[in-house]
Amino acid sequence: MVWDVFGWFRDVLASLGLWNKHGKLLFLGLDNAGKTTLLHMLKNDRLATLQPTWHPTSEELAIGNIKFTTFDLGGHVQARRLWKDYFPEVNGIVFLVDSADPDRFDEARVELDALFNITELKDVPFVILGNKIDAANAVSEAELRSALGLLNTTGSQRIEGQRPVEVFMCSVVMRNGYLEAFQWLSQYI
């Protein structure tokens, strides 16, 4: 009973922005999708020329009233084998897709479907970011949703027994679209 009252009080304070929450986020997706660039932009508010991620990296970020421990796990085939090691106690997954590389949409869908089928992640909210919308050959949100099989996401609704999933289109280099995704995600943490 005491914990219920404390939890209710904490939720009220958090809704008013008076309680700091903490979450663990994983940045996943295929190589060259923009995971490291996004994390660098969130941390340093500037672009940089970055090398592919060969080893997992961790950063502490504050977005709004939430402090995140983030893990950039790399997207090359060897790195994907390590993803499962970071699933315990994860609060959210940010899955990036290069929206200007439709040749790799099938590969991204296979990885995303595999993640959706992991029991340990059944309640973990997923943000799918269609990155690089500034590129001339980037697909639309509807095309990306179709290619990834994400036609019925939860949007802003909380649906009992259904994992929160939403797609946002963004351009990390143009600083566009990703903050909305983190605002959406923060309501579930």
Swiss-Prot record:
NAD as a keyword of this entry, yes or no, is no
Keyword Transit peptide on this protein?
no
Q: Which residues bind GTP?
A: 29-36, 72-75, 131-134
Q: Name one GO biological process term.
A: vesicle organization
Which membrane topology describes this protein? Peripheral membrane protein
Extract one GO molecular function annotation from the record. Answer: GTP binding
Task: Spell out the subunit comment.
Answer: COPII is composed of at least 5 proteins: the SEC23/24 complex, the SEC13/31 complex and SAR1.
Family, per entry: Belongs to the small GTPase superfamily. SAR1 family.
The protein depicted here goes by the name Small COPII coat GTPase SAR1
